UniProtKB/Swiss-Prot annotation:
Designated name of the protein: Origin recognition complex subunit 1
Site-annotated residues for Histone H4K20me2 binding: E93
Description of post-translational modifications: Phosphorylated during mitosis.
Residues covered by the BAH domain: 44-170
Length: 848
């Protein structure tokens, strides 16, 4: 879509047209038409039933709606102007998970009838940007692609938040009746801008001077006697210093851009002249004079020549066509060359015979720009052609244009003309006709074209070549079921918490309001799993119309590099766009805090909330503040491990916005852990009953962490499988296997490292403890410890090591982080400390 008026800082004023139609029941005054004045220059009359553009979050893609009513609320002081609309939605406004339901690639100009009544249909009149043309099509029709329909929108389907459907017959008929009415331009009354009127006065002054003044001949151009005679009768005359200033010309060009482009290349009365090989033609028109005397704006992107029709003057029959060609000033210090209008005279006979022609030299930069524009348009046309053979012909024409970009004839003929009812084959015939007829066939084989990659490739995960292997044994099946990521059929022992969270979110969805809930509990108590189960059940209920549809977004504080990145993650998952943290926070605040901006409720799950804490606590404040706004459809579910997190680290203004809706997940008891294990191992005999009872009681006494319990059982199956392969036990997890797994799980890594250390390393640790007890300090030098080490070796009858060997032992224990040592350059004065308690060292060194 092109840029709209909202990008320019325009001043719009609105006024009613006609008499009001009072509504005594609602104290409203209804109107049928409103006048919108832009910058005091142009007036646009908009009636009920027309389609309008409405200001939105993105200026490039404003909202589209149909006017249903125009009214003024008399109860307000001062009275405000309102409009009731029927919304349309663009494809980018549809939630990302549901865009695949369309089943095809949408057009950039396609919109959808919004068939849902849960949004606010009353808007302020000041938010209207202007009218827009909307064309209704049948579902099987194709959207036309041409220059004339750039600012036209097309509607084929409707969207009801669940799927796409064809337009209702009555709505389709109503939309097509609107198309048969008076076109949009007839309702727009434009006031001439000063710049354009100045240009018109200048042209009229030039016309009036033809009959009285002598024609001035430019030395660069030659005029035949016939042309001179015609000029004396009433043709255009050029005076020496008569030039339109660059400012007047640019202002006239800018004022024309606001009007709709109606003219086309086919509007010229005479056939286009064919340039000679050495001539470069840059064709355009500033204005085309019709038979009625009115000016019609006409632009082309690569335009430079200004033409007028021969039928512009009624009173005089001219035999000479006048063309205004630009004359660039040769000023050396000007930033941009000023353009003057020079009448250029071309006789009809000379035009038909193509004998009197003057080459117009253009700069290399302008030629390069025109060539690139030609290539761009040809490539766009190539994508629209489905025939492979025609594609190859177009690519050959592209290569010919690239080689000879200095020839403007090929550029002019290669540009696809605007739609004038001619088939595509005619333009292809013209291009092939311009080539020499006698060509020697190339002996070398044609260049083979590589297959093009798809225009819009969809990234996807690679398919699995081999099927997933089935578990080979009972123990392997048990390990799969006991994995933390395995989703069980149900969540036992959390029925009450599930019901409370479900009721809270369901009530907010039904009421269309926002809220916040704080969920706390120690790790492994099922907080995240319970919330996921609630969301899954609510999504199933939304598919059966039991609850309104909603959008679900989940962020985890552990996956963020910085707390403010939570804004970026939320915005990307909601809209699919990327932005900086500050800009994303502004967009989210505008979406959640403005009334009527949301059409669906958003459920936001924030896991590991305590990791989003900052010094100013602005992230937590915004997350808790957004649901409190009036009309904000945002439900925030926060999860943290600390029960008193709001009172301990949050400010009062942040904790107050959190609300009183809190829930605490208590640690699992031994009976609950046993029930969880039994439900996972349902119909699978892999554990002894006593083993399950033992691991449940052990874990419940320590932490009540269900994840730790599942990990211990999985490790026990691995130990059992290894012992079964050696033939030591049967394929059943016993109490001994579980005790071994529990010892591995709950024992410290430092204790395990000390137990597995060498005799010399264990002797050095005993020497450290002996020196600490002797000195009464928790720190000693390497020289003092070495003396104790030598004494202990003599008492035990062991050969004592050298100083270098003892230094190597100390460095190894320091690398294992069992000791805290200084750099070895201190040598004998190296200070040594224990990184674990003395009791743990003595426990690891005791003889069993």
């Amino acid at each position: 879509m092109p840029s709209y008026v909202t990008r320019q800082k325009t001043r719009q004023t609105f006024s009613w047209v006609g008499r009001p139609l009072p509504n005594r029941k609602q104290f409203y005054q209804m109107y049928k038409e409103i006048c919108m004045k832009i910058n005091g220059c142009s007036e646009i009359h908009i009636k009920v039933g027309q389609f309008v553009l409405i200001q939105g979050e993105d200026n490039q893609k404003p909202y589209v709606a149909k006017l249903i009513e125009l009214f003024e609320n008399g109860s307000e002081v001062p009275p405000k102007k309102y409009a009731r609309v029927q919304w349309f939605v663009r494809f980018c406004e549809i939630p990302i998970p549901k865009r695949h339901l369309l089943g095809r690639r949408p057009s950039a100009q396609e919109i959808f009838w919004y068939d849902c009544s849960d949004c606010d249909n009353d808007i302020h009149v000041e938010t209207i940007i202007g009218p827009v043309q909307v064309v209704a099509l049948a579902p099987e029709d194709e959207i036309p692609v041409n220059q004339k329909s750039e600012e036209t929108l097309f509607v084929k389907l409707s969207w009801n938040k669940k799927n796409f459907a064809p337009l209702p017959p009555e709505e389709l008929a109503a939309l097509r009746r609107l198309e048969c009415q008076k076109p949009l331009e007839a309702k727009t009354k434009s006031v001439k801008s000063p710049s354009w009127s100045t240009a018109e006065q200048e042209v009229k002054r030039i016309e009036s001077s033809h009959s009285t003044s002598r024609s001035y001949q430019d030395p660069a151009h030659t005029v035949t006697p016939n042309a001179m005679k015609s000029l004396e009768c009433g043709g255009f005359t050029r005076k020496p210093n008569m030039r339109l200033s660059r400012k007047i010309l640019c202002d006239s060009l800018d004022s024309q851009k606001t009007c709709k482009r109606r003219a086309a290349f086919s509007e010229t009365t005479s056939p286009p002249k064919k340039p000679q090989p050495g001539e470069i033609k840059t064709s355009s028109a500033l204005e085309t004079l019709g038979k009625n005397g009115h000016t019609q704006p006409f632009f082309a992107k690569s335009s430079m020549v200004l033409r007028t029709r021969g039928t512009a003057v009624k009173t005089t029959k001219l035999t000479v066509e006048s063309a205004l060609s630009p004359v660039r000033s040769r000023s050396r210090y000007s930033v941009a060359p000023s353009v003057g209008l020079t009448p250029q005279y071309i006789g009809r006979k000379a035009k038909e015979q193509e004998t009197h022609k003057e080459p117009i030299h253009t700069s290399l930069r302008a030629r390069r720009r025109s060539s690139l524009l030609t290539l761009k348009r040809i490539k766009q046309q190539l994508w629209l052609l489905d025939d492979d053979k025609s594609d190859q012909e177009e690519e050959e024409s592209i290569s010919s244009v690239e080689v000879s970009d200095s020839s403007s004839e090929e550029e002019d003929e290669s540009v696809p003309s605007p739609p004038t009812g001619k088939p595509v084959g005619q333009s292809r015939t013209r291009r092939t006709a311009s080539k020499p007829s006698s060509q020697t066939p190339s002996k070398s084989p044609k260049k083979t074209f590589r297959p093009r990659p798809p225009l819009h490739a969809t990234p996807q995960i690679r398919d699995r070549n081999l099927a997933v292997q089935e578990p080979a044994s009972v123990l392997e099946e048990a390990r799969l079921r006991l994995h933390v990521s395995a989703v069980p059929d149900s969540l036992p022992c959390r029925e009450q918490e599930f019901q409370d969270i479900y009721s809270f979110v369901e009530s907010k969805l039904l009421d269309g309001t926002g809220g916040c809930m704080y969920i706390s509990g120690v790790p492994g108590t099922g907080k995240t799993a319970t919330v996921h189960e609630v969301i899954r059940c609510l999504q199933q209920a939304a598919q059966t119309n039991d609850v309104p549809p909603f959008e679900y977004v989940e962020v985890n504080g552990m996956k963020l590099t910085e707390p403010h990145q939570v804004y970026v993650q939320i915005l990307q998952k909601l809209t699919g766009q990327k932005a900086t943290a500050n800009h994303a926070a502004e967009l989210l605040a505008k979406q959640f805090c403005s009334r009527g901006s949301q059409k669906e409720t958003t459920v936001l799950l924030v896991d590991e909330l305590d990791l989003l804490w900052t010094h100013k606590q602005d992230v937590l404040y915004n997350l808790f503040d957004w649901p409190t706004h009036k009309g904000a459809r945002l439900v925030v579910l926060t999860i943290a491990n600390t029960m008193d997190l709001p009172e301990r680290i949050m400010m009062n203004r942040v904790a107050s916005r959190l609300g009183l809706t809190r829930m605490s997940f208590q640690p699992y008891s031994h009976s609950q852990l046993k029930q969880i294990l039994v439900s996972r191992l349902k119909h699978l005999k892999a554990f002894e009953d006593d083993a399950v009872q033992l691991v449940a009681r052990k874990v419940a006494a320590l932490s009540g962490d269900a994840r730790r319990c599942l990990d211990i059982c999985r490790r026990a199956t691995e130990i059992c499988e290894v012992s079964h392969q050696r033939g030591d036990s049967q394929c059943l997890v016993t109490v001994a296997h579980l005790m071994e797994a529990i010892d591995e799980m709950f024992s410290s890594s430092y204790i395990t490292a000390i137990k597995n250390s060498s005799v010399l390393e264990q002797s050095f640790l005993r020497a450290i403890i002996a020196e600490f007890r002797r000195s009464g300090l928790e720190e000693a030098t390497f020289q003092q410890i070495y003396s104790q080490h030598v004494a202990l070796c003599r008492m035990e009858g062991l050969p004592y090591p050298t100083m270098s060997e003892t230094m190597a032992v100390c460095s190894r224990l320091g690398s294992c982080r069992i000791l805290l040592v200084e750099p070895s350059r201190n040598d004998l004065l190296l200070r040594v400390r224990l990184n674990v308690s003395q009791n743990d060292v003595l426990y690891a060194l005791k003889e069993e």
